[in-house]
Design a protein with these regions (language model features):
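N-terminal beta1-alpha1 cap of cysteine-dependent amidohydrolase-like domains
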Residues: 1-180, 187-244
């Protein structure tokens, strides 16, 4: 979690953690400018059925509230977050095994002229994404391009912005964008690299289009921002926030 908070704070974005099993969806919805679904090493095969159900209930509730209220409410999913957005829109768990661990280029789809995200990037940066080991991929699951094409719900809702290759050379979807709503997702981890800050800049510009205000942000900031995470030497790269 710390890497995501540090990533957002680089651009002055304040973070308000939302418990995945909260019942106060309306309260949180009015306090945030958008929803971010982070990656996690606790995938659907590791989480309990109750945890998965609670997470999906909250995601579905926030999504339906944004649709019902007709507000510009950006939603972003990273890795695990992308998988759950696909499950929400596609109606079932359609991801398959696409293991990847390391830095990989991504291939930008041909028809991205209508993409809000891709069109926000300068051409030299798009070249960098395709020609260099530009994105950190760390996942076991993903979704194939074929699945995005054959699932009518996904095909109508999302545009495939980019693809990448897993350890065995199989192609999977690396980035998607809703055709009509501010919903975005990537399978890689832009929060782990400074070179992927343009993705954050884009999402920041999307958040600015929402007018919600959080009256308790100063208090939240005092709790979160200066907080020193507990660091456990036995868990490599593991840093945790604790909330009472």
């Amino acid at each position: 979690m710390k890497s995501y908070i540090d990533w957002f704070e680089q651009r002055g974005i304040r973070v308000l953690p939302i418990p995945f099993d909260t019942q106060d969806h309306e309260v949180y919805f009015q306090m945030v400018n958008g929803l971010f679904l982070p990656g996690t090493d606790r995938g659907p095969d590791r989480a309990s059925a109750a945890q998965n159900e609670a997470f999906m209930h909250s995601l579905r509730t926030f999504y339906e509230m944004s649709m019902r209220k007709g507000e510009y409410f950006p939603i972003w999913g990273t890795c695990f977050g992308m998988e759950r957005l696909i499950e929400l829109i596609g109606g079932s768990r359609t991801w398959k095994s696409f293991p990847a661990d390391g830095l990989f280029p991504i291939r930008i789809s041909r028809d991205t002229t209508c993409s809000r995200m891709i069109q926000s990037f300068p051409l030299p940066y798009l070249d960098y994404l395709e020609q260099e080991k530009s994105t950190l991929q760390y996942h076991e699951y993903g979704i194939s391009v074929e699945e995005m094409k054959t699932n009518p719900l996904l095909r109508r809702y999302f545009s495939v912005l980019a693809t990448s290759l897993d350890k065995s050379g199989k192609e999977y979807v690396a980035a998607i964008e809703s055709k009509h709503y501010p919903v975005y997702a990537v399978q890689f981890h832009p929060e782990q690299q400074r070179s992927t800050l343009p993705f954050l800049d884009f999402f920041r510009s999307e958040l600015k289009m929402n007018s919600h205000r959080c009256p308790m942000l100063p208090r939240v900031g005092k709790v979160i921002s200066p907080h020193k995470c507990a660091h456990y030497e036995g868990l490599k790269h593991q840093m945790c926030y604790f909330f009472s």
